[in-house]
Amino acid sequence: EERETIENGSNVASKSGFTGILLNSNTKPVADNQTDISFIKLKSKNSICNIYPLGALTISSKSVEMAELFDMKNSGAVGFYDYKKPILNSNLLKTSLLYSQSFDSVVMSFPMDQSIAKKGIINEGMISVSYGVKGIPNFSEEIQINRDLHILEYTGGKLHIPTISTKKSLDLIKKAKSKGLNVS
């Protein structure tokens, strides 16, 4: 198996018709500081397609302590996301949304309440039952989105929810947008 690099990732993206791609923060090491983002920007300077790095929202993507958001933004990060990991601490999301407004940046939040999802791997339903795999109840996603939108309504800022899988989740986001919240 070949290790993906910035160069070959850029080449594949370009051949697939993309002119720019987001680079998630789940690199090795996790891109959670100014040096990591500067390195990514330097290595991608001559790439065929534009690379837009995301910085980790928290140190080592552990959802404990906020990373150096302002410094990463100044080094070229376009947003902040602990790749496929929910923000467990509501106050951390609140603080991140408040702080990121001062430098016009976006916070991304993975929509899953882990205490409900546990070790599920697909949405709970007929397919999970027929394959005999642990399902994730829909409300695991919807509870997290609802919490995040309430916090966004309180703080303002920009919130991106990178994946949704239920109609109710979509309806929650539509309702928030109709209230003027900056959510995508």
Mark where each language-model region is:
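Histidine/acidic residue-rich metal-binding segments in metalloenzymes
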Residues: 66-184
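Alpha-helix-loop-beta-strand connector modules within alpha/beta enzyme cores
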Residues: 34-54, 98-112
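Structured loop/turn residues at beta-strand edges in well-structured enzyme cores
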Residues: 16, 49, 75
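Metal-associated gating/positioning segment near the N- to mid-region
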Residues: 1-45
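Glycine-/small-residue-rich active-site loops that bind phosphorylated ligands and cofactors
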Residues: 28-32, 60-61, 85-88, 165
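Residues at alpha-helix caps and immediate loop-helix transition turns in enzyme cores, especially N-
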Residues: 5, 32-36, 64-65, 92-93, ...
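Active-site mouth loops of central-metabolism enzymes
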Residues: 1-4, 25, 49-65, 84, ...
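Short beta-strand segments at enzyme active-site cores
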Residues: 20-24, 54, 108-111, 161
